[in-house]
UniProtKB/Swiss-Prot annotation:
UniProt biased composition (Low complexity): 1-13
Entry superkingdom: Viruses
GO biological process assignments: DNA replication
Keywords: DNA replication, DNA-binding, Host nucleus
Region (Disordered): 1-26, 329-434, 446-470
Keyword presence, DNA-binding: yes
Species of origin: Human herpesvirus 2 (strain HG52) (HHV-2)
Name by which UniProt lists this protein: DNA polymerase processivity factor
Name of one Pfam family that matches: Herpes_UL42
Length: 470
């Protein structure tokens, strides 16, 4: 039995799943994937913003579609292409994996680059042979001067199937997700990408306020539940009313919609590659999906529009505060740090310099809705002083500055409880709920393979991150 990352064991093939000697000598039926007409134009639009970012990728092909997997600046990137997006999609046999790069200059995905073939008419992928030694052949047609389709034989590419591969895919429903427009996501990404002000905190407070802040910048939005007719929170109504005073357009720019916005949280991301990755992918508007209850919490950014590309960024496990679960793992021993006047920085990216409606008129010793103000879960370093709103953050003493080399010691993380304690006794044996990773894999030497197109280590089968994956 093969052991994969995370301590999970790959389930071996059953005797019924192992092909007989006669079956091994016979080829699988030819698999054919065709793009032409409106479907071809749709795929070209999906790849247009990606440019050359995904040319060197792993293509996982199955009966549900094609998954393009890559790593940009060390972060995992996924682009799912559902079988319904193709003009013809016929697949038989187990899931296959192909490296898209053919040589130093050409790739299976080069055909989808903008202006690569101005008169592109048809793209056809044919997979023949016996698994795991199948061959993929890509053929393309363009429009000739007389209007007829002509095949470019010199552009035909051939690729062999990978005999051994493993791809881990995050899966499950997000605990909280927020939908942001292009200007809203740009503000968030600019705040996260400040190299001199990391780490950055993502926080959803009980007052209905979603904030992204670090030592230099703060971006704040009013979070509302998707499809909610009216909010039951008085603080959300006050905040929304205050925003509407500046006009409906300003109110819309300051409001984000999502699901499970009642689940307050405070998480920290210490990696500044988010801005670089999303700029490389040319992501405009997108959805922030927070997976907070996993052993390794993460945030997934999924682009809106024709290219539903997603990038996954890991969060610091010891800096996750979840009030709605009644616990704060690791060093987060206090309640949620959602009081903006004390937890958030003072130098804001927002154009308005007025205090937010949730803070206006609040007593110094009381929090929102008359509750006693709790200390921030992640207090500032002792060497930092705050001045009047809009002032810079000034170090109190040079001796307290962080050295140029090395990083401050992270708080000790509490030991994670066993799977049986969190998800039930069946979870530790591969059943139950709570699974966060699905896997495609095949090991040629041991004969182990994923028993189905989508295999999960723990929990029921779910579309990873809502993707329609193979």
């Amino acid at each position: 039995m093969a052991h994969l990352p995370g301590g999970a064991a790959a389930a071996p093939l059953s005797e019924d799943a192992i092909p007989s000697p006669r079956e091994r000598t016979e080829d699988w039926p030819p698999c054919q994937i065709v793009l032409q007409g409106a479907e071809l134009n749709g795929i070209l639009q999906a790849f247009a913003p990606l440019r050359t970012s995904l040319l060197d990728s792993l293509l996982v092909v199955g009966d549900r579609g094609i998954l393009v997997h890559n790593a940009i600046f060390g972060e995992q990137v996924f682009l799912p292409l559902d079988h319904s997006q193709f003009s013809r999609y016929r697949w038989g046999g187990p899931t296959a994996a192909f490296l898209s790069l053919v040589d130093q200059k050409r790739s299976l995905l080069s055909v989808f680059r903008a202006n690569q073939y101005p008169d592109l008419r048809r793209v056809e992928l044919t997979v023949t042979g016996q698994a795991p030694f199948r061959t993929l052949v890509q053929r393309i047609w363009t429009t000739a001067s007389d209007g007829e389709a002509v095949e470019l034989a010199s552009e035909t590419l051939m690729k062999r199937e990978l005999t051994s591969f493993a791809v881990l895919l995050p899966q499950g429903d997000p605990d909280v997700q927020l939908r942001l427009t292009k200007p809203q996501l740009t503000k968030v990404v600019n705040a996260v990408g400040d190299e001199t002000a990391k780490p950055t905190t993502f926080e959803l407070g009980p007052n209905g306020k979603f904030s992204v802040f670090n030592a230099r910048t703060c971006v704040t939005f009013a979070a509302r539940e998707e499809g909610a007719s009216s909010s039951t929170s008085a603080q959300v109504q006050i905040l929304t009313s205050a925003l509407k005073k500046a006009g409906q357009a300003a109110a819309n720019a300051k409001t984000v919609y999502g699901e499970n916005t009642h689940r307050t949280f405070s998480v920290v991301v210490d990696d500044c590659s988010m801005r670089a990755v999303l700029r490389r992918l040319q992501v405009g508007g997108g959805t922030l999906k927070f997976f907070l209850t996993a052993d390794v919490p993460s945030v997934c950014v999924t682009a809106t529009g024709p290219n539903a590309v997603s990038a996954v960024f890991l969060l610091k496990p010891q800096r996750v505060c979840l009030n709605w679960l009644g616990r704060s793992p690791g060093s987060s021993t206090g309640s949620l740090a959602s009081q903006d006047s004390r937890a958030g920085p003072t130098d804001s990216q927002d154009s308005s310099s007025e205090p937010d409606a949730g803070d206006r008129g609040a007593p110094e010793e009381e929090g929102l809705e008359g509750q006693a103000r709790v200390p921030p879960a992640f207090p500032e370093p002792p060497g930092t002083k705050r001045r009047h709103p809009g002032a810079e953050v000034v170090p109190a003493d040079d001796a307290t500055k962080r050295p140029k080399t090395g990083v401050p010691a992270a708080p000790t993380r509490a030991e994670s409880p066993p799977l049986s304690a969190r998800y039930g006794p069946e979870a530790a044996e591969g059943g139950g709920d709570g699974g966060r990773y699905a896997c495609y894999f095949r090991d040629l030497q041991t004969g182990d393979a994923s028993p189905s197109p989508l295999s999960a280590f723990r929990g029921p089968q779910r579309p990873p991150y809502g993707f329609g994956l193979p």
